[in-house]
Amino acid sequence: MAPKLCVICNAERAVLRRPKTAQQICKECFFYVFETEVHHTIVSNNLFKRGDRVAIGASGGKDSTVLAHCMKVLNERYDYGLDLFLLSIDEGITGYRDDSLETVKRNQQQYQLPLKVLGYGELYGWTMDDIVKSVGRKNNCTFCGVFRRQALDRGAAALGVDHIVTGHNADDVAETVLMNVLRGDIARLERCTDIVTKGPDGSEDDQHQEGCGSSGSNGIGVGGSGIRRSKPFMYAYEKEIVMYAYFKKLDYFSTECIYSPNAYRGYARTFLKDLEAIRPSSIVDIIQSGQNLKVSQVVKQSRKTQLQNCLRCGYISSNTVCKACILLEGLEKGTPQLGIGSEKSRKIKDIRSENSKEVEKVSITADGKERKERRIPQWTGVAKDAPPISSLPFVPPQHKVDLSF
C-alpha cells in the first residue's frame, strides 16, 4: 500500500495527523501552518506595533520554549520590528525550577535573546519551598500564582518593556472557562477569553490579577498604565505545541511542577481531555462559548473597582493593600490562611470569628449572689443584617416524602 501524501503539498509523505483539523500532513507543511496561524493571531488582534519591547515569559517548558522560537522566527520573517527579551521567574522549587532554568539559559544562547531572571527569594524573602513548609500543599498554588504575576510585572518594569507574552494555549484558556463556570465566577468569563489583558483585572489564570508597582504617568503604576499581556498561542492546541517542539527538536523541560498535582485546574484539565477525545473541536468550542456569553451589567458593575497603589509595596491594587502583601503578612505572622480564598468566603470567616468570641453573662442567684458565666455562642451562619425568617417568602418543597410505614 502506497504511503499517504500530505494533503497540503501533495508531494511529501504525511507523517502526522493534526489534532486540530485531523489533516494528514508532512512535517514542513505542519511547521508552516502552525507558524502561519500564530502569525494570523498576532496580526488580526494587533498585538504589537513596530518598536515594541516584548518580554517572553520563559519557564523552560514546552509552551514558552515554542513561543520563544516562534516569536523569533516570525519577528524575522514578517519584520515585526520587535525587541525581544526572555523573562524568567525563579519560584525557588528545588528539583524543578532550578533544572528548568538551566533549559532557559540554553534557550537564551540558542536564540541569542537577553535574559532576566527574578527570584521569589529576592523579591519576597520566601521561596516556594519555604512557603510549602509553612502552608502545606493544599493552597500553595494561590501563593505562587499571585507572586509570579507580580514578579513578571516587576521584571518587565526592570527591562523597560511594553508587552509581556505568555505561552498560554487553547487548552489553558478552555480550562479557565470551565473553572470559572464551575466556581460560578461569571464576571471573569468575559475577560478570561480576552487575548490581550492589561491592568488588575486582566488575569488569564484562576487567581486575582493585579498590576505593577513602578510609577507610571497616571500615578498608579506600570500594570495600570502601559504593560500589556497577550497570548499568541490562544488558539494553538497543546498537542500541536508538543508536536512542534518534538519535530523541531527544541530544547525544553518536560517535568510537571512537584507542587501542582492537586491543583483545582487539574480536574478541569482531565475533563477537557475527555471531551477532546470524543470531539477535538471541544477546546475551541468552549473558548467561543466563553467569548459569546453575555455578562449582565449588574455583574460587570459589581466587579468594577478603583485602582490605587498598595500602601506597603506600591504595587497597583484594587485594595489599599495588595494580595501579595496580605499573603506575605500571613506567612510572617504564622497565619498563612490570611488572604486565601475569595472576598465572600473571607467575610464568612470574619462572621464566624466575630460570633465565636467569648461573652460573659452575669446573673443573680436566689441567695442574692452574683454569678458570672463565660460561654462561646454557637455560630448560626446568619449575618447581622440578614432579614428575619418571617419576612422571607415561603418556598414549598419540590418533592413530598412518604413517612408512612
UniProtKB/Swiss-Prot annotation:
<dbReference type="GO" id="GO:0005829">
    <property type="term" value="C:cytosol"/>
</dbReference>
<comment type="pathway">
    <text>tRNA modification; 5-methoxycarbonylmethyl-2-thiouridine-tRNA biosynthesis.</text>
</comment>
<dbReference type="GO" id="GO:0002144">
    <property type="term" value="C:cytosolic tRNA wobble base thiouridylase complex"/>
</dbReference>
<dbReference type="GO" id="GO:0002143">
    <property type="term" value="P:tRNA wobble position uridine thiolation"/>
</dbReference>
<keyword id="KW-0963">Cytoplasm</keyword>
<dbReference type="Pfam" id="PF16503">
    <property type="entry name" value="zn-ribbon_14"/>
</dbReference>
<dbReference type="Pfam" id="PF01171">
    <property type="entry name" value="ATP_bind_3"/>
</dbReference>
<protein>
    <recommendedName>
        <fullName>Cytoplasmic tRNA 2-thiolation protein 1</fullName>
        <ecNumber>2.7.7.-</ecNumber>
    </recommendedName>
</protein>
<dbReference type="GO" id="GO:0002098">
    <property type="term" value="P:tRNA wobble uridine modification"/>
</dbReference>
<dbReference type="GO" id="GO:0034227">
    <property type="term" value="P:tRNA thio-modification"/>
</dbReference>
<dbReference type="GO" id="GO:0016779">
    <property type="term" value="F:nucleotidyltransferase activity"/>
</dbReference>
<dbReference type="InterPro" id="IPR014729">
    <property type="entry name" value="Rossmann-like_a/b/a_fold"/>
</dbReference>
<dbReference type="GO" id="GO:0005777">
    <property type="term" value="C:peroxisome"/>
</dbReference>
<dbReference type="InterPro" id="IPR011063">
    <property type="entry name" value="TilS/TtcA_N"/>
</dbReference>
<keyword id="KW-0808">Transferase</keyword>
<dbReference type="GO" id="GO:0103016">
    <property type="term" value="F:tRNA-uridine 2-sulfurtransferase activity"/>
</dbReference>
<keyword id="KW-0820">tRNA-binding</keyword>
<dbReference type="InterPro" id="IPR056369">
    <property type="entry name" value="CTU1-like_ATP-bd"/>
</dbReference>
<dbReference type="GO" id="GO:0032447">
    <property type="term" value="P:protein urmylation"/>
</dbReference>
<feature type="region of interest" description="Disordered">
    <location>
        <begin position="197"/>
        <end position="217"/>
    </location>
</feature>
<dbReference type="InterPro" id="IPR032442">
    <property type="entry name" value="CTU1_C"/>
</dbReference>
<dbReference type="GO" id="GO:0000049">
    <property type="term" value="F:tRNA binding"/>
</dbReference>
<keyword id="KW-0819">tRNA processing</keyword>
<dbReference type="InterPro" id="IPR020554">
    <property type="entry name" value="UPF0021_CS"/>
</dbReference>
<keyword id="KW-0694">RNA-binding</keyword>
<dbReference type="InterPro" id="IPR035107">
    <property type="entry name" value="tRNA_thiolation_TtcA_Ctu1"/>
</dbReference>
<comment type="function">
    <text>Plays a central role in 2-thiolation of mcm(5)S(2)U at tRNA wobble positions of tRNA(Lys), tRNA(Glu) and tRNA(Gln). Directly binds tRNAs and probably acts by catalyzing adenylation of tRNAs, an intermediate required for 2-thiolation. It is unclear whether it acts as a sulfurtransferase that transfers sulfur from thiocarboxylated URM1 onto the uridine of tRNAs at wobble position. Prior mcm(5) tRNA modification by the elongator complex is required for 2-thiolation. May also be involved in protein urmylation.</text>
</comment>
<dbReference type="InterPro" id="IPR000541">
    <property type="entry name" value="Ncs6/Tuc1/Ctu1"/>
</dbReference>
<comment type="similarity">
    <text>Belongs to the TtcA family. CTU1/NCS6/ATPBD3 subfamily.</text>
</comment>
